[in-house]
Amino acid sequence: MTKEYIVIAFTENQIGELNRITALYLRRKINIESLKVSESSIRGISMFVISAFTTRETIDKLVKQLRNIIDVIQVEYYSNEELITQEIALYKITSKIFRESGTVDRIVREWNARIIEMNPQYVVVEKTGTREDIDAMRSELEQQQLLTEFTRSGTVVLHRDSVEDKLQANL
């Protein structure tokens, strides 16, 4: 059964790591839904968070292959239930529509979003939340024909237990 899995990999901060890791997804024909790479709490160690829909069998094989990459220190996969996940999204709406429609203000309040910039041409609204919440707010703005631009971050995660404690033990 296909479902969303989130792979968290810790690697040494070396040139080419992103390419080596994503190449394994490409070889297995797995579409990456979300990708975030950042410094971990340990200097010189990068944290990759990769979200994709696949089967458990495929993700097991992929993680085994990821463990064979030289600079990969630790790699595990998780379901959404095991993690605290958030994304950030920015929605651009023309100022004229914003001024003339009370709908935008209602949507901003309803989705617990916030206005981060207003000028004569446009209004930028920021929403932090789950992928589902961000998609639902986007869908509502699109249905009302209010949205002119949209962008989102990759998934940011924290494990409900301490993943980095395990990492420290592996160093």
What do these predicted ranges mean?
Residues M1-M47, F53-L171:
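Long, contiguous binding/interaction regions
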